[in-house]
């Protein structure tokens, strides 16, 4: 049988950048990183940008170069933007619809966050049913939306986004990696067993880059020093 008998896919790919110096075009960096991670997911993609605390983004079905035309990418490029997240999706759970594309942006009573997720939750259906019984309304069918609801609920109850993510991870079962962007912070996390890959790079001007694979660090148009695999 040919090596190319099956479609190319590698689950999903996540990316995040925090540019402390504010000298990089973080939207362009996210685009280049997603292009490098395209082999991990070909169904949909998205980028969210933090422009001085205001989070906006674009996501849709299609390949990176199809979804992010020069006009779309230009609308995300802001001189004061210092953080961005990005995602390429191959559906391991949920349908192939735009509502399942990432990053998912949530606006709640304590602010706004954008969340990217790679992996699978073995208790996603159980968590979804619990949330629906509490009044949650889901627009898609992915595990990621379940995680978004849990982080949001915990953020409304807890003192920080870090604690909210930690409390959420206490009830998640499965293999996953996360990149979460709030108005002031960029946070990356993995399941306790570290099954899903996540690389970390540092920026020479100060800041960090997170990605599912080191190829995204090499091709994100940023000089990466000391990339390490976590």
Show which residues each predicted segment covers.
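Conserved short alpha-helical segments that host acidic/polar catalytic motifs at enzyme active sites
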Residues: 1-221, 225
């Amino acid at each position: 049988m040919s090596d190319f008998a099956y479609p190319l896919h590698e689950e999903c790919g996540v990316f995040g950048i925090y540019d402390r110096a504010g000298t990089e075009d973080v939207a362009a960096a996210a685009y280049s990183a997603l292009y490098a991670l395209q082999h991990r997911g070909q169904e949909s993609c998205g980028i969210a940008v933090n422009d001085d605390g205001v989070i906006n983004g674009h996501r849709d079905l299609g390949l990176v170069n199809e979804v992010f035309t020069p006009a779309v990418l230009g609308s995300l490029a802001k001189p004061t933007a210092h953080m961005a997240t990005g995602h390429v999706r191959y559906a391991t759970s949920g349908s192939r619809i735009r509502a399942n594309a990432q990053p998912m942006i949530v606006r709640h009573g304590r602010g706004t966050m954008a969340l990217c997720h790679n992996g699978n939750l073995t208790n996603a259906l159980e968590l979804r049913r619990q949330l629906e019984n509490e009044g949650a309304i889901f627009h898609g069918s992915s595990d990621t939306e379940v995680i978004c609801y849990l982080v949001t609920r915990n953020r409304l109850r807890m003192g920080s986004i870090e604690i909210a993510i930690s409390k959420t991870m206490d009830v998640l079962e499965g293999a996953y990696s996360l990149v979460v962007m709030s108005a002031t912070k960029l946070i990356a996390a993995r399941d306790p067993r570290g099954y899903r890959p996540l690389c970390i790079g540092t920026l020479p001007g100060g800041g960090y880059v997170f990605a599912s694979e080191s190829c995204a660090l090499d091709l994100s148009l940023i000089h990466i020093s000391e990339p390490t695999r976590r």
